[in-house]
Every structure is written in C-alpha cells, then in structure tokens.
Amino acid sequence: MPRAPAPLYACLLGLCALLPRLAGLNICTSGSATSCEECLLIHPKCAWCSKEDFGSPRSITSRCDLRANLVKNGCGGEIESPASSFHVLRSLPLSSKGSGSAGWDVIQMTPQEIAVNLRPGDKTTFQLQVRQVEDYPVDLYYLMDLSLSMKDDLDNIRSLGTKLAEEMRKLTSNFRLGFGSFVDKDISPFSYTAPRYQTNPCIGYKLFPNCVPSFGFRHLLPLTDRVDSFNEEVRKQRVSRNRDAPEGGFDAVLQAAVCKEKIGWRKDALHLLVFTTDDVPHIALDGKLGGLVQPHDGQCHLNEANEYTASNQMDYPSLALLGEKLAENNINLIFAVTKNHYMLYKNFTALIPGTTVEILDGDSKNIIQLIINAYNSIRSKVELSVWDQPEDLNLFFTATCQDGVSYPGQRKCEGLKIGDTASFEVSLEARSCPSRHTEHVFALRPVGFRDSLEVGVTYNCTCGCSVGLEPNSARCNGSGTYVCGLCECSPGYLGTRCECQDGENQSVYQNLCREAEGKPLCSGRGDCSCNQCSCFESEFGKIYGPFCECDNFSCARNKGVLCSGHGECHCGECKCHAGYIGDNCNCSTDISTCRGRDGQICSERGHCLCGQCQCTEPGAFGEMCEKCPTCPDACSTKRDCVECLLLHSGKPDNQTCHSLCRDEVITWVDTIVKDDQEAVLCFYKTAKDCVMMFTYVELPSGKSNLTVLREPECGNTPNAMTILLAVVGSILLVGLALLAIWKLLVTIHDRREFAKFQSERSRARYEMASNPLYRKPISTHTVDFTFNKFNKSYNGTVD
C-alpha cells in the first residue's frame, strides 16, 4: 500500500491550526464588507444579499454572510455568490500509436484547450491525461566535442550512423540523424591565438602535431534518414585544440536548439540532442575573461556556411537561458560525459528540465547503448511544466501514475511503459482580482512534448446585481446611486438612504456612533455625522466598520510584510490565502518542499510543517531528515524481504514475504551491476558464509525497485588442516628467510672486517729488535779456573 502518513499528518496539522480560528467566527461578517464586490473577496463561502429591505438599516455588513444564514434571515432569490467553473473547449482523444510519419496528427495530451472562470479563493479542478504513444518519430542530433582529447572517440564513431540507426529502428519506424561539432571560442584565453597557431594549433605537440584551426560551433549535417551521409560526414572530421580545459559546448547546444530550420527539427517528432564531451563546459560570465561582456541573446547566429558567427561577440549562455530554449523547442538534452565529470552534469539535470546524463566510456565505444538507455529513460516518464503562469494564480497538482495511486503535490510520473497513460488533477485558485476585464492565458506542457493544454483564465470579481444600478435613484433620495440593495451617496451626502448632508448637527444621536457606552465616538478614527461614522482616511490603508473599529493594516507582520504577503488583513486579523495558515500567514501547507527525489516526505522520519521538515525519528536530521546515523538503514530494512524470498524460493505471494515486501518491486538477476550510479548496493553474509547482494532504487511512488541475485555468491570452503599447515609453513619460511638474511649480513660484515685487517697488515713495516725482558732458554757462562786432577790441567767452560 502507498506511503501516505506523512502528508496526511501534515494536512491534519494544518486543519488543527485552523480550527481555533474558525470556531465561533463568521469570517464573512467579521470582514465588515461595505459592497458586494468586497464581500466576494473575503472568502469563497461568503454571499451578498441584494434585497432592498433586508437586514437592519444601520448594519450594512449583515448583507455579507454565509449563504445559509442569508436564506435563514429572509433573503431568498437575490443572493450573489458566484462560483469558479471551467469549460472544455477542445478535447481530441489520445492516440494509441504513432504512424511513424511526421504528417500524422498524433495526440499525446488531452484536453487541448480549457476556459476557466475563477472567483478569488474558490478552487476549480480539472483532469488531463498524457500518453507516450508507440512508434513516435525520433529526430536525433549528435553534437560532438572535437577538441584534441576526443580524437580516439572520433575514430570509434566513424560507423556510428549505421549501427545507431539499426538499433533505433527497433524502437521507431521513422528515425532521422544529424551531426554537429564544437571546440571553443577562438579568442584568448580560450584558444591559441598567436600567429604560428592560426592554421595549426597543434604545432609543437609531439603526440599529435597536426590539427585544424579552433572553432566555436559547426552545423555539419541537417537531420536526415540517410545514415550513409552521417557516416561520410563523420569521416571528414578532424580534431582541433583549445587552450583551457573547459569547452564551449553550451554555445553549440543553444544554437542546435534555436536554429530549427537549419537543423531540421520536425514539429511532430521526439527531439533528442546528444551532447558528448570529456570535460566541463564554460557557462555565463566566463566570456568576460576574453572581454565578452554582452550576454547571449538566445537567437540563432548560423551563417550560410552553417558556422556560429557570434562566438567571439557574445558571452556563453546561462543555464537558465539554455533550459528556456530547450523547453521552448521541446528538446531533450542527453549529456554523454566521462565518469569523472558525471556528478557535475548530474547537477545540471536538476536545473535544466528534460535533461538526462549517461556515463560515456573514454573512447565512446558504449555510445549506442548509452543513447538507447537515455531514450528509454526519457520515454518512461512524464513531467508537467507551466508556461506563463499568472502571478496571482495558485496551481496544485495531483498525479495518478500507472499504479493507480494518487500523489498530491506531484506533477511527474516515472517508470511508465510506452502506451501507459498518466493522469493529472489540476486545481486552480485566484488569490485576488486583477484589473477589470483582464484575461490571462497560460499553458501546461509535458517536458519534451509538442502537445500542450492552453488555459484561458477570466476572473469573476463583479456581482450580477451591479448591472442594474440606478443613478440618482429615488430610493436614495435622489442623492445617490442604488446598487445591490445599497445607496452609494453622492459627495456631501450621508446615510443609508443618503438622507443627510455632511456637517449637519446630529449631536443628540451621537451615542449611535459609539461601539459601547464609554467608548470614543467612531473609535476615535472618524467623525459622527447623520447618526453614522464617517471614517478618516489613513496613509497606511483603509479604516472601516460601523464604528470605524476596523482597518486593513493592523494585522501581524512577518519580516515587515503584512500577513507575510500571503493573506488579506481584515479588521486586525489575517485572512490567509489558500495554502497558508498561521496568525501572519507565514506557514505554507504545501508539502512539495518536503518531498525528496525518491518521493518520500521527510524521508519518512518526520512530518512537514510550514513547508519544512520537522524530524521526529530520534537521531534524524538534515533538510529532509535524510541523515540518521542511529536509524536502521534501508539495506537492513530490505534485507528481511530478501531473506524471506530466498527462504521461500523467491515467491512473494507467501503471506510473510508479501508483508515484508509490500513496497518492493522485485527483479531477479544472475549478476549485480555494482557501479550503477542510480542504485544503492547492499550486501550481507548469510548463515552459510555466503555473500548475498542486491541493489535498490527508491521510486517517487514510495516503492522501491529491488534487484536481487538469484543465488548468494559462495566460495569453496578451504580445509582447516590446509589452513593450519599453510600458516605454520608461512611462519617457518618467514623465520628461515630472516635467519638467512641475518647470516648473509653477518658474513658480509665479517668479510669486510677481515679484508680491512689484511689490508692494514700488509701495509705495516717493523724494525728488528730484541725484547729486553726476553731471555734465551740456553745460557753460556765462562769460568776462569784451573782443574788439576791426575796431574792434568783444564781450562774451559762449563755448560
């Protein structure tokens, strides 16, 4: 079932805020209206009685009351209470299929013309339907960046026309293709302007020394069904070189949009403008760097040679001008950009209606699939845009998409299939009355469509009884005009029947000019004359009422603005316009400002109060309560659904799974695209140590597109002993390696030390000397004596 508690809660808050003001208060009589026209402006429920003898002669305001009260008090058929209405002037039925021919009148939106008559404050509601018909003609203009960095891309698209036409003719029988190219403005600092670079800006560039002179934009091939012409034109092209990184592509986009005759856009065809580049664009005010101070005029400036002649004369176009001209000519812009610039161009899509962005491979090999994806994305959604909306008109939208659920405050449907019909309920309300006999015309147009609904608005701000006015009527004593049951007295006359002249002494009846005993005459803001108050004029506004007790300038203000500019001041109290509440009408009941891109109100973590999210989930914060570190994330929430489906073999009709997956649109796949920029990737570990992956995309309807793997990814479980041996072996190997390294280092060190020792030893030189402390082991002593034995003598040494 759809998620609606947040908007419902916001509406209940608005009603609760209004109840204290409405209880016991008759907004019609409290407004002190003194004419039929003033009465009708107070509130759409107020009515005026034009019966001559109705009510108290002194109480003019009693004529302005609720219709039921007027009837109860005796005013029968003379009640003025017009209501808003509309009348369908032209309503051709929706086509079911295009003929594939531009000559066929294909209707994708109905009705086509409506006349609306509005009473201020009174809403009127009508329905319109939009359908993307089958086999609708397609015009595709390929706009390519031919700066030097795109050379490999140019080489890869030389046969693009044939392949692209084959794929597109599977979607439509009437397809035409055109081609244009751009670089940048041929002035400094955007391009090389030195004389040596005039004919070849690539001089001195080693990788690619030859290229053509720089240029702004060239329209090379008008839209044609001859794909050979496209291929031939692409083969002729050569790249150029500019000086700075940004390119002048937005100049080219604008010219391709506004030069309708040159490009050849057909009236009855889907217009696709494919913009391919690998860098960021120049935008408005960048041209001042080159001395270009004239803003872009939004006009076509292609000469007979189909070259952009104002490139060096005007600044780059702004995003606002670009969006206006693309919408004006029903052109869907497709940004085909490299991945590193994806987010920049993604932000551009939020500022330029009808724009999509796709990631282009570095060599443009995926360009055909990219275009097909963008085409399917464009054809799967319908978004209403408003053209020339009058300032005093409020519009409210409610979308009913393919699921049959109504989404208040939304004017876009996504996820449509070709042939689906999207319905929109449009409510109009006038806030005030413009000058008399004013008629406004505005248009409702689906973005990128030729079809539109023209709405003519007239304002019901006069009373029917005003037609029968009686100048100098006898009912007014010949001194005033009788109109709608009252006398409008001529200057100098007063009284309900103009029976008194201004200045007559009526002091005896002065108490009739006091609101209560003891209070000042006419509340101190008027003179009592002819038994009634004549209120003073004030520079701040109007003073009125039977006792001059009311004014239209003493109400609450917000930032110095009376009733915040969203209401009317009546007798000291703000009467808020539809869509606003509060004492000073500063609180908007519009919940669209609280709706995120996924269609959820305050991320379902709070309620919308006065156009701002009030976060109620503990820990939630942010403009849309989108940040919540302590909240269960969407992956955890959707995991229950996925696990239930796995348990029950993917059958969502199981009662438990149906409850858990009631807001999910399930798609089973064999492989998950992990780099999808639009989807959120979730994964978790199962009980069997497998990894289960899924992605989800939140839809504006409150549901989610859930893409789930058919089977969890499970690897082969390794043997425990294998793991143990591997770990032990690794430790031993690391230890042995460390020991070997240590031994090697020690050996190297020892060898160096030994070599050093040997070197020093070889260089050493010593003298021969004896150690004085050294004694030889053999000593010789000489004894001088004579030995006589046996009459022999001996004279020698003894050892």
UniProtKB/Swiss-Prot annotation:
The keyword NADP does not apply. Gene3D superfamilies: 4.10.1240.30, Cytochrome c1, transmembrane anchor, C-terminal, Laminin, ligand-binding face of the semaphorins, domain 2, ntegrin, alpha v. Chain A, domain 3, von Willebrand factor, type A domain. GO terms for biological process: cell adhesion mediated by integrin; cell migration; cell-cell adhesion; cell-matrix adhesion; endodermal cell differentiation; epithelial cell-cell adhesion; integrin-mediated signaling pathway; stress fiber assembly. Its main location: membrane. The modification Phosphoserine is found at residue 770. Ca(2+) 1 binds at residues 149, 152-153, 362. Residues 743-799 are cytoplasmic. Pfam families: EGF_integrin, I-EGF_1, Integrin_b_cyt, Integrin_B_tail, Integrin_beta, PSI_integrin. Ca(2+) 2 binds at residues 184, 242, 244, 246-247. GO terms for molecular function: integrin binding; metal ion binding; virus receptor activity. Keywords: Calcium, Cell adhesion, Cell membrane, Disulfide bond, EGF-like domain, Glycoprotein, Host cell receptor for virus entry, Host-virus interaction, Integrin, Magnesium, Membrane, Metal-binding, Phosphoprotein, Receptor, Repeat, Signal, Transmembrane, Transmembrane helix. Mg(2+) binds at residues 147, 149, 247. One of its GO terms (cellular component) is integrin complex. It comes from the Eukaryota. The chain crosses the membrane at residues 720-742. Residues 24-719 are extracellular. It is a single-pass type I membrane protein. Disulfide bonds join 28-46, 36-463, 39-64, 49-75, 202-211, 259-300, 401-413, 433-461, 465-484, 476-487, 489-498, 500-530, 513-528, 522-533, 535-548, 550-571, 555-569, 563-574, 576-585, 587-610, 594-608, 602-613, 615-625, 628-631, 635-682, 641-661, 644-657, 690-714. Residues 136-378 form the VWFA domain. The VWFA domain (or beta I domain) contains three cation-binding sites: the ligand-associated metal ion-binding site (LIMBS or SyMBS), the metal ion-dependent adhesion site (MIDAS), and the adjacent MIDAS site (ADMIDAS). This domain is also part of the ligand-binding site. Belongs to the integrin beta chain family. PANTHER family: INTEGRIN BETA SUBUNIT, INTEGRIN BETA-5. Heterodimer of an alpha and a beta subunit. Beta-5 (ITGB5) associates with alpha-V (ITGAV). Interacts with MYO10. Interacts with DAB2. Integrin ITGAV:ITGB5 interacts with FBLN5 (via N-terminus). ITGAV:ITGB5 interacts with CCN3. Interacts with tensin TNS3; TNS3 also interacts with PEAK1, thus acting as an adapter molecule to bridge the association of PEAK1 with ITGB5. Integrin alpha-V/beta-5 (ITGAV:ITGB5) is a receptor for fibronectin. It recognizes the sequence R-G-D in its ligand. This is Integrin beta-5. The lineage of its organism: Eukaryota, Metazoa, Chordata, Craniata, Vertebrata. The gene is ITGB5.
